[in-house]
Each structure stands twice: as structure tokens, then as C-alpha cells.
């Protein structure tokens, strides 16, 4: 029988009032929200179930720095929301856990569901090596080892991380899908994608360029907006047509543009891999 893999929002919450508020506010279609007030129970749960956790929610308390140290030492990298008290003083500067963490105060809990989506979206853009602060990364062998990945395989590695093959990607918020955007938002997104894709093409054969980061950015935007492969193809064709006209004006051959079919194949392969892994596995 086919069924989706259960996913969980896992919290370490010291205040019963905040725990109850999380349960009341959490209406996401992710299957389950569990939280603990005991750090030991929280860690035991992660040891047993970390591969089913979609996002962590950590209420900041006296023991939180030690919990974060435990997460770093065990190379447990997950989307995370840190909740600080609502006070006149701003929360302490981060990052505390990793650079994609989302900071909330207790008077912002009404934003919980949207911020869970933000935490997941921000996290999947990061490779394991850039997710944690550098002073942590190079001090901890487990994390350092996980960061030594051939740049050409960074997206694949990210997809195999804690979220990767467990189906979190099919939990996208359909409200942000391209087909549901206003005409103005559609134009804005397409302009952003065209700009990023143009940069990818111009830098693709430059070994010094950060082209993989550009591809990751393009694919993330396209995936979470549910952009089709045919739309990506249209962006490529439009750009090649522009370049072709420019080459003709300069009296140069268009043959060079054939090389950029590799760029298109690379981008579409990354996007298709995202979509493939968004389909729940059969068990």
C-alpha cells in the first residue's frame, strides 16, 4: 500500500503556554507536531526519528546553547526556528545554529506556519558546508567531512540531507505557486528567473565563477513556484534568440550558442531531480 512518509515538526519548548500556542497555531499539512520540555527526551527523539523531522522549533533558554552544541557535534542540520522572549532588547545576534535559522519572538507566534515554510525554503538553498558558522564547521570533524563535497554534486547532496528523500518538498505552499500569482508577481518572478539564468549562461564555462550557486538559486525559485520545465525551456530559447541577434549584428557565428545546450540540460536535470524527490516514496 502506498503512503507518504510521515514528517514532523519537533520542538524543545520550556514554557507550557508556548507549547500550547504552537499546537493551537500549527495548521500546516505536515503530519505531526511534537514538542518536549525535557532536553534529554528531545535528544532521544532526534536520535530515533531525525530522518522524519522537517523543522526544529527551539525556545531559547539556559540549556539551548548546549542543545545547539549537541546538534553540531552530531552533524544534525535541519531547518530551525528559534523563539526568543518578547522584550525591549532585541534577540542576540546569530547565527546560533546555522545561517538559515529563523528568529521569532513570543509575540510573533501567529507567523508560525509561514515561518516554517521560510525556514525550510531557506535551508534547502544551503549546502551542508555553508550552513553552519565557519568557527563551528572547522572545529567539528563530522561537519567538516560533510562539507567536502564536489561542487557539481552539491544539490544532490543537499537533497540527500535530513530533508532530502523524505518528501518534505511536496509540502510546498501552493499559495506561492506560479499559477496562483497575480500578473504583477508572475512578471516579477519571470524577470528574476531570466536574470539569474542569463548569469548562469554567461558564467557557465568560467571555472572561477560560482555558477553552482546560481543554479541552486534558480532551481529553488522555480521549484517552490512550481515552474514547469517548458517554462525553463522558454527562458533559455528567449535568451539564445537575444544572443543570436547580437552575434549576427557583430558578424559572428552562432555556433557557439550550441554549447549552451549543456547549460539547459544541467539546469533542467537539477529541477527534475527536485521534482522527482518531491514525490512520496512507496512503502
From Swiss-Prot:
Residues 173-281 form the KaiA C-terminal domain. SUPFAM superfamilies: CheY-like (SSF52172), KaiA/RbsU domain (SSF101215). Residues 164-172 are annotated as: Flexible linker. GO terms for biological process: circadian rhythm. InterPro entries: CheY-like_superfamily, Circadian_clock_KaiA, Circadian_clock_KaiA_N, Circadian_clock_protein_KaiA_C, KaiA/RbsU_helical_domain_sf. Disulfide bonds: none annotated. It comes from the Bacteria. Keywords: Biological rhythms. Residues 3-163 form the KaiA N-terminal domain. Residues 3-133 are annotated as: PsR domain, binds oxidized quinones. Homodimer. The KaiABC complex composition changes during the circadian cycle to control KaiC phosphorylation. Complexes KaiC(6), KaiA(2-4):KaiC(6), KaiB(6):KaiC(6) and KaiC(6):KaiB(6):KaiA(12) are among the most important forms, many form cooperatively. KaiA and CikA bind to the same region of the KaiB(fs) form and therefore compete. The N-terminal pseudoreceiver domain (PsR, approximately equal to KaiA N-terminal) binds oxidized quinones. The KaiA C-terminal domain mediates interaction with KaiC, homodimerization, and is responsible for the clock oscillation function. Key component of the KaiABC oscillator complex, which constitutes the main circadian regulator in cyanobacteria. Complex composition changes during the circadian cycle to control KaiC phosphorylation. KaiA stimulates KaiC autophosphorylation, while KaiB sequesters KaiA, leading to KaiC autodephosphorylation. KaiA binding to the KaiC CII domain during the subjective day yields KaiA(2-4):KaiC(6) complexes which stimulate KaiC autophosphorylation. Binds oxidized quinones via the N-terminal PsR domain, allowing it to sense redox changes and possibly mediate clock input. This is Circadian clock oscillator protein KaiA.
